[in-house]
Each structure stands twice: as C-alpha cells, then as structure tokens.
Amino acid sequence: MAVNPLDFLKNMSSVKNNIDNIKKEISKITVCGKAGSNIVTIEMDGEFNVKKVSINKEFFDDLDNDAFEQMIKSALNDAVSKVKEEIKLKTMGVLPFGM
C-alpha cells in the first residue's frame, strides 16, 4: 500500500499540534515534594524548575546538618517523581508511536 505524502504531512501537522498542546499542559504542572513529615517542602513546575523551598522552622533547630540535607534531597526527589508522573498522565495516549 502506497503512502500519500499529503496524508503524511497532515498527520505530522497533527502530531506537532499535539506536542504543542502537551508542552502547554506540562508548563501548567505544579507539584510539591515533601520530606520529614512536611519539615521540608519543595514546589516544582513541569519543567523541573524549583519554584519554592519551605522549611518548617519549628523543627529546624532540632535537626543536624546531615538529616537536614537528606530531607532536602528526599523532597527534591519526591517532587521530580511527581512531575514525571504528571507528565506521563498528560501524555498517555496522545503521542503516536510510543514517543
């Protein structure tokens, strides 16, 4: 069966529109990664930019440096995982060929 080049171009235009829509949806994603019973909270957008870091000062003085660093790392990893999951949900079934 021969492929019509015009149909192919129409499909590519549709794919481009889908990708543009997905990019818009991803840019709207905002998640919060949390660690240590919410001692550290990190807000991240869909492009993996950290928008806000919150530290519950009530617990801050009681933490040693290693524990605090571990909580920051855990909160960042939690936020990254949540962004990836949101992207996966928003792109599922939209892109062709398993893109």
Swiss-Prot record:
Binds to DNA and alters its conformation. May be involved in global regulation of gene expression. Binds specifically and non-specifically to DNA, preferentially to the 4 bp broken palindrome 5'-GTnAC-3'. Affects expression of a wide variety of genes, encoding both structural and metabolic proteins. It comes from Borreliella burgdorferi (strain ATCC 35210 / DSM 4680 / CIP 102532 / B31). This is Nucleoid-associated protein EbfC. One of its GO terms (cellular component) is bacterial nucleoid. Induction: Transcribed at high levels in rapidly growing cells, but is undetectable in stationary-phase cells. Keywords: Cytoplasm, DNA-binding. Homodimer. Can form tetramers and octamers in solution. Changing residue 20 to A: Forms homodimers, but does not bind DNA. It is found in: Cytoplasm, Nucleoid. Changing residue 23 to A: Forms homodimers, but does not bind DNA. Changing residue 85 to A: Forms homodimers, but does not bind DNA. One of its GO terms (molecular function) is DNA binding. Belongs to the YbaB/EbfC family. Changing residue 84 to A: Forms homodimers, but does not bind DNA.
